[in-house]
Structure formats: C-alpha cells, structure tokens
Amino acid sequence: MIFDKEDYKAFDPELWNAIDAEAERQQNNIELIASENVVSKAVMAAQGTLLTNKYAEGYPGKRYYGGTAVIDVVETLAIERAKKLFGAKFANVQPHSGSQANAAVYMSLIQPGDTVMGMDLSAGGHLTHGAPVSFSGKTYNFVSYNVDKESELLDYDAILAQAKEVRPKLIVAGASAYSRIIDFAKFREIADAVGAYLMVDMAHIAGLVASGHHPSPVPYAHVTTTTTHKTLRGPRGGLILTDDEDIAKKLNSAVFPGLQGGPLEHVIAAKAVALKEALDPAFKEYGENVIKNAAAMADVFNQHPDFRVISGGTNNHLFLVDVTKVVENGKVAQNVLEEVNITLNKNSIPYEQLSPFKTSGIRVGSPAITSRGMGEAESRQIAEWMVEALENHDKPEVLERIRGDVKVLTDAFPLY
C-alpha cells in the first residue's frame, strides 16, 4: 500500500476515527443481517489497490481508452472464474450492484410498459422485482405473485395459472427473504408455457449455489443475476450470467454504454479474488455451515410458541420470525436486539398487515457469523439470547447481562 494507517489518521483523523469505530462495532456485534458478510483480507486488499486510478470503458480487447492491457487481464480473470464457478458460458462482471444488473437484464429483454411477473415484496421479493417505489415498478408493468397463505411456500400451480392470465414477457424468480429452496426448473416450465423469458436473481443464495447447497438456476434461466457480496462473500457489486450468446451481447450493451460508464476495476479485482475463494474446496464447507447455523437458530425460535418462524423453518441462510406476540413490531425487535449488540433487520412477512417501516417480522441470517467461525452451538446460544432479550425487552438488567455475554462470544471469534 502507498500509505499506512498512521498516514491516514494524521491526514484525516475525523474519517479514520469513524472507520475505527465501525471496525470496533463489527468486532463487538453479532451480525445477523442476511445480506451482510465478512470479506477476506485478500478481497479488501484487492479493492484498495491503484486499479481505482484506471478508466476502462468497454470490455477486454474492446476498450475506448489506451493503457488497458493489464486491466484486461484483471477483468478476464474475474469473467473466467465466474463462468467456471457457476457453469455459465458468458459472464459480465461490470455491474456496480445487483440492482444495476437487474436493470440491465430488463433493458436487454423487454420494453418499458411490458408485463413482468415478480415475487411480492412482503412474500420475500426484492425492490427491483417490481416494487412501486423502484425503477422496476415505475418503468414496467409488474404483476406480483405470492406464496400460499397457509404454507407460506411458493405455489407453482398458482403461479402458472397467474402467468397464463397476465401473459408476461418476463418472469423474475429469486428472493431477498424466502427461506426455502426455489424450484428453478418449475419456473422455466412456467415461463415456457407462456412464451416468457426467465430471469433468476440469485443474489442471496449465490454462495450456496457455488458451494453446491442450492440447485443452480443457470441451466434453467435465460439470464441469472447476482450480487457478489452476501453469501458469495465478495465485494459489493453485481454479476450477470447467461448461456445465450445473443442475450449476452444485449446484456453487454445494456451495462455499457446503456447504464454505466467506466467499470470499477478495483472492485472487479476484488470480485476475482472472491470467485477464486469460492472455487476452493473449503468454500463447500462454508456453505454447509451457513445452512446448519441458520437451521439451528430457527429451531430455537420454533421451541418458543410466542414466536412464529415463517414457513416453519429454513433450507438456506436465512429465516423470518413473526415477533408480534412478544413486542409491538419488527422495528421494536430490531432496536431491542441492537441494545444487546445483535444486529438484524425488521422485515415484512407474507400478507403483511403493518407498514414496511414497522413490519411484523425480523429477518435472521447466518453468513457473517459463519464466516467468523461460529457453529451450531454458538448459533443456538445466539438465538436463545434473542428470545430472552425480546421477552424481557423492558428489563434493563437482563439486557445488560446479555450484552456482556455477547461480548464474551465476539471476543472468542475475532473478525480478523
């Protein structure tokens, strides 16, 4: 590195003090936000390189600026590793985020005003799957599909019937808060039945797909998008995969020049590192442990009747819990748990009755604690603390004791 930490602190103490404070917070908190993780030092090192200095509009071998021969090597490494990891023929590693990756797919495959089907936000979908406040809902005619009200699982027969009724040009599968395995083969059958494209947003489960613990959407989807953080444990960014050469050309044009200018090559370098890490056999064990830890926490909540785990459990890295029999709403639960240094987010549940600013539920995820080396025993203990804190949210002495117990645990599992 060009400067060391002391150089930074001397130049900008206000900023570095904030960074130090965040480092302390991450070390001393149990992180259960399902979309967050702990990246490796190698990922951070790559993202902090002088690659940030270089403009490289275009793609490897087809740049608009000179001096990009080395940049081409970096980006090609990321592309080839993504293709190998997910078994895809084409990969675009330039999207700055998952949202921009999704926007590029929409721009490539459909026109403004076209009908699209996506998962309802309260059922577990994502803002970019048609939420009215998102560009997706404002630009396209999104029709939401839901989960079954009783089982809280995807009902593929109902989705097929709905697709036959609305005749979408595109069907979006994937979720940000759905705890069960998604049957991508079924979704492809539905898409084929109505002549629609199928796009899968696997942002949340990409790491589990990579580790072999969730079926891959790549053989079934016309296009697959993902983020490179979350369970994939890389830098914040996006990635697009396809096996169709014609679609790949459209996607490349949609990303650049359609949506973005120069790619963030320092971030792409960090993506390459994360993809290499995911190709390592050790990553399979990580994916297995992520699922075991989530299941262990869900099992604890299932043993306490005042908490209701949505759909009864989990097969991936997250689950939702209805907390309204214990506290007023999910926002209150989030705040109570933050008092004991357990961080998660309030979350809508299927057929939500409260506003998204309050919600009936919380979302619990295991990727970050698993990256710190915590296992099923620690996961169960964390869930027990959560239950105890929420049931005793009006007892400061209980919260103080739990906060101390959390500190002992986080000290035993250093962030780095």
Swiss-Prot record:
Q: Which domain of life is it from?
A: Bacteria
* Enzyme Commission numbers on file: 2.1.2.1
Q: Give the record's GO biological process terms.
A: glycine biosynthetic process from serine; tetrahydrofolate interconversion
Enzyme class label: transferase
Q: Name one GO molecular function term.
A: pyridoxal phosphate binding
Reaction catalysis annotation: (6R)-5,10-methylene-5,6,7,8-tetrahydrofolate + glycine + H2O = (6S)-5,6,7,8-tetrahydrofolate + L-serine
One of the record's GO cellular component terms:
cytosol
**Which residues are listed for (6S)-5,6,7,8-tetrahydrofolate binding in this entry?**
121, 125-127, 355-357
Quote the subcellular location field of this record. Cytoplasm
Keywords on record: Amino-acid biosynthesis, Cytoplasm, One-carbon metabolism, Pyridoxal phosphate, Transferase
Names of the cofactor(s): pyridoxal 5'-phosphate
- Tell me the subunit arrangement: Homodimer.
HAMAP family named in the record: SHMT
Q: What is this protein called?
A: Serine hydroxymethyltransferase
Q: Which gene holds the coding sequence for this protein?
A: glyA
